A protein has these predicted regions:
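Conserved SAM/AdoMet-binding glycine-rich loop
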Residues: 76-219
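Contiguous mid-protein beta-loop-alpha structural module that forms a pocket-lining wall or clamp
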Residues: 197, 217-218, 223-230, 241
Length: 267
């Protein structure tokens, strides 16, 4: 009866219930007034197997589960009966065991004359292959988003985003060679253990991408690290706003010098 005092015996224990997902969740109503107008959004996967240390989706929705391939094809066909715009949704759609088959399925429809516009949630660097890019380009995408999170391999290892610089540069080359016009790189500032050298690594990465891929448009979007409950970084404090603003100004200034558009949100 004392306000603010927790008494366990009066509280219910909530058990997490994880089940297989055999049914596909998709947009029930198509309208011009939606955030994505007349777009049929299809959930391909739920959860994520990568377990980046900052990511709530990785831990809240464990384990990674995928919609059955045949079910996805049926739902895609259902959507295309009502609109030509489809979007594939999931925290890690490229981990679907039939992701490349789905891309091929849609690509063949386009090659057979069907007008389809397809978009995907951001892809991992190691998901960029010639076939995936060709499908995106055929479906009307000119640019795509890559979540690299940090500029240095050291800091990516800290957050369990195990991507090398060479993988990033290879993804850019594949994208350019197969028709994409540009990438937007998504990253964070204020990640635990981040140093000035990690920020400078972002600038060096941008310089090399521009140098090796003339005419390929790149931009950066940054947000600040915010600790999430139920993740390995839940007890890491958020960096103070003045420090984040200083880092933000540095990145914006240095990227602008080399002709790269960037914006920072959530400070």
């Amino acid at each position: 009866e004392i306000d603010g005092v927790y008494v366990p015996k009066y509280s219910k224990i909530v058990n997490k219930h994880t089940k297989k997902i055999s049914e596909c969740i998709y947009t029930p109503i198509l309208t011009e007034d939606a955030f994505f107008p007349n777009t049929f959004i299809i959930e391909m996967t739920r959860g994520c197997a990568n377990r980046c240390g900052f990511c709530l989706a990785s831990y809240l929705n464990l384990p990674l589960r995928s919609i059955p391939y045949e079910t996805l094809k049926q739902v895609i066909d259902l959507g295309l009966e009502n609109t030509n715009k489809i979007a594939l949704l999931g925290a890690q759609i490229s981990a679907h065991p039939h992701f490349h088959d789905i891309c091929k399925y849609i690509y063949e429809k386009i090659q057979n004359g069907q007008n389809i516009e397809m978009s995907v949630s951001s892809l991992r660097v190691d998901a960029i292959t010639p076939d995936v890019v060709k499908t995106l380009v055929a479906a009307g995408q000119k640019n795509s988003t890559l979540a690299i999170e940090a500029g240095s391999e050291r800091l990516r290892r800290v957050i369990n985003k195990n991507l090398t610089e060479e993988q990033i540069f290879n993804a850019v080359k594949i994208a350019k060679d197969n028709g994409l016009k540009g990438f937007k790189f998504y990253g964070m500032i204020g990640i635990p253990t981040e140093t000035q050298a990690d920020l400078e690594a972002i600038i060096e990465l941008a310089k090399r991408v521009k140098k090796e891929n003339k005419g390929f448009d790149i931009s950066f979007g940054f947000s600040s690290f915010v600790p999430k409950p139920h993740t390995p970084f839940q007890w890491c404090g958020r960096e103070d706003s003045k420090s984040l603003e200083k880092k933000s100004n540095f990145l914006l200034k240095e990227l602008r010098k080399i002709g790269v558009t960037a914006h920072v949100s959530s400070i």
